[in-house]
Every structure is written in C-alpha cells, then in structure tokens.
Amino acid sequence: MTRIESTDRATEQRDALVGRLFEAAIGAMEVATIYTGDRLGLYQALDEAGPATPSQIAAAAGIHERYAREWLEQQAVAGILAVEDPAAEATERRYLLPAAYREIFLERDSLNYLGGLLRLVVGASRPLDAVLAAYRTGGGVPYPDFGVDTREGIAAMNRPMFVNLLGSEWLPAMADIHARLQADPPARVADIGCGTGWSSIAIARAYPTVTVEGFDLDDASIAQARRNVAGAGLAGRVTFHIRDAADPELVGRYDLVTAFETIHDIARPVEALRVMRGLLADGGAVLIAD
C-alpha cells in the first residue's frame, strides 16, 4: 500500500511539472509574439485605428499584410485581441485591442504597464550561448552583452514606480529625509546604479531644490540617462557619471544615497554598500529598494 501511494504521488508530481513546464513554454512563445507587436508598433496602430483589418494594420505599421494577418490571428486566439466580425473572410476581419488591456501594452507610465518586463525577458535570453560558456570556463558575461532590449526593458519596467511612487510615497515615508530634501541649504542626492536615469529625474522633480548625481558603470545607460534628463529639462540639477559603485575612490557627501533595483545586479554588492555608507553626510540616510 505504501509503495502504491508513493508511486501515485510521484506520478502526480511528474504530471504537475509536465503541465507547468508546458504552460511556461507556451507562455514564452506568447511573450515573443507580444514583443513582436510591441517592437513593430502593432498595438499602437490598433489603438489609433480602432477596429482594423490586416491590410489596414499592415499599412499603418509599415509591414507586409500576410504577417499582419498571422500576428492578428495569433493574438486573437491567445485572448489578447478581440475580433469584431469573426465570420468575415480572413482578410476582412477587423481586430481591436480591448480598452481593458490598453494600460498593459501602451501606457508606459502606468503601474500596470508590462511592456518593459516582456522586453527584458526577450533581452535576457539573447546571450545564452555566452552564459553557457561562462558556466564552463568560470568567466562572466558583461552587462553590455545583454543588449538594448535588456537595458531598455529594465528601464521601462522600473519607470512607472519612479514616476508614480518615488516622490509621492517612498521618500515622504522617510520623514526626516523628506524634510531635509525640502530644506536649505539644498540637499545632495547620490543615485547608485541609476541606469537610464528615471529614478534621478523623479527625485529632482519631487524636490525642486535638490541636486542629484547618478552613477552607473554602463556607458550606454549613462548616455541614455543624459538624453532623458535633457528631455526632462533638468540637466542643471541632475548629472550622471560612469563609475563603479564598488570603487572605494568614489567619494562625496550626500544627504541621501539611493539604490533602486540594482544591488542584486552588482558584482560586488558588499563593497558597493560599504561605499554607499561612506558617501553619507552627517544625518544622511541610505535608501535601498530591491
């Protein structure tokens, strides 16, 4: 009896894992089709055109009609798009993005926006051959090798939190720091692992007198951060530097040192935390969100 029960339990465990991995594989392919629609502007085209045929979406997005039709049909079967007239000929069916899903794909400042996360998933898979080689050799895979999808995916995934929460909830929850950021003389903030700069920009927008210095080791991220801050009109108060957060020669005195969604990515996190502590002015604080 014990052996039969054990066998039944093993079968249940096996079947559960088979089902889970099968669903994960289908989900991975679905992510790829969503990535395709995002990168080609197909969701945007649907949003602007309303119910539209494959040829109309193809013209709006600048792609071939056959590929537009295949993508639209797949998205409808996946339950992402709706079909207004399913009985029509394949070339005449009109597709639309349900209003309930608009936030997920198009509203980049919304906390429900998932385009960044899905782009990150695709980007993280690109250097798998290099990751396999690193396992064999003990080497590493430099962050730039993960490419633009990883970099911009992370930025787009984190941006809504900074836009909606950083200046209105997170920092005000630290009453003493919130007061210091509004006081004279103007406070100084160091934003460690700033990436493309959205956290630094959010701090500067929330506290109009502070100066923010962002630090990141990735050249491409800092270049984008500088473009972002110029577009935000805050270049006079927000500056960015290509520096290693774990470098003991990183010095300064700051009223607030922040690290948002970055400690888990730093090769030497303990050293980075030590440097962050050393950057504090008297009465300053370190804020880590990870």
Residue spans of the language-model regions?
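Conserved Class I S-adenosyl-L-methionine-dependent methyltransferase catalytic core
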Residues: 8, 12, 20-45, 60, ...
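Short helix-to-turn junction characteristic of helix-turn-helix DNA-binding domains
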Residues: 46-50, 204
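Alpha-helix C-caps/helix-loop-beta hinges
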Residues: 49, 77-78, 283
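Conserved beta-strand signature within the Rossmann-like core of class I S-adenosyl-L-methionine
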Residues: 283-290
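A short glycine-rich, Lys/Arg-flanked "PGG" loop and its adjoining helix->strand segment in the class I
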Residues: 270-282
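Conserved adenosyl
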Residues: 2, 124-271
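Short acidic, hydrophobic short linear motifs in intrinsically disordered regions
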Residues: 51-59
